Amino acid sequence: MISLLKKLYFTFSRSSRIIITLVIIDQLTKWWFINNLRWKPGLMLKVTSVLNMVYTWNYGISFGLMREYYQYSNTIFLITNMIIVCYLYYLMICSKTIGSFAGYSFVIGGAIGNLIDRFCRGAVFDFIHFHYRNYSFPVFNLADCFITLGVIILMEDYFSTKKVIEETSKGNYDNLQIEVMAEKIRHTDHDSKI
C-alpha cells in the first residue's frame, strides 16, 4: 500500500510539473498576444512568407468545427473535455514507459490550456497561421502544438514498444538483448522519469 501511494505521489508531482509548465507557457503566450498587441479580430501580422500571427477566437472545436452551435455547445465542450482530461490522466498514471508518460503529459497540458480559455473567455484564442500558396492551415495555438506533439510521442512509443514485443515473440534475441531493449523504452522507477 505504501509503495502504491509513493508511486502515485511521484507520478502526480512529476506529471503536475510538466503539465503546469505547459499550461503556463500556453497561457502566457495567449495573454501576451491578447493584451499587448491589441489587434482587432481578423487582422494579421506577417512574420514570414508562410507564417502569420492572427488574432482570432475559436468558438468551435478543433479547426473551428461546430462553431455555429457555440451558444448550445460550450458547456458540452467543457464537460466532455474535462472527462477526457481525467481519463488521460488515469492512463498517464498507469503508463509503463517514459514515452507514454511524456505523451500523455503533453496532451493533458495542451487540453487544459484550451479548457482554461473556453472556461474563462468562452472561446479558445488562436493566433498561429501557416499558409503556402493556395493552402492555408487552420489557425491554432501552442496548446494545440502540445497536443499534437503528445500524440506523436504516444504513437512513437506505441510502435517502438510493439516492435520489442514482436521481436521477442519471434525469438530473434537472447534474454540479455531483450532486457537491454526493453530497458531503453520502459521505466522501472518513477524517480527516473522526466
From Swiss-Prot:
A GO molecular-function annotation: aspartic-type endopeptidase activity
Pfam families registered for this protein in UniProt: Peptidase_A8 (PF01252)
Major localisation: membrane
Source taxon at top rank: Bacteria
Subcellular location: Cell inner membrane
Active-site residue list: D126, D144
UniProt-listed NCBIfam families: lspA
Protein name stated in the entry: Lipoprotein signal peptidase
Organism: Rickettsia prowazekii (strain Madrid E)
Classification lineage: Bacteria, Pseudomonadati, Pseudomonadota, Alphaproteobacteria, Rickettsiales
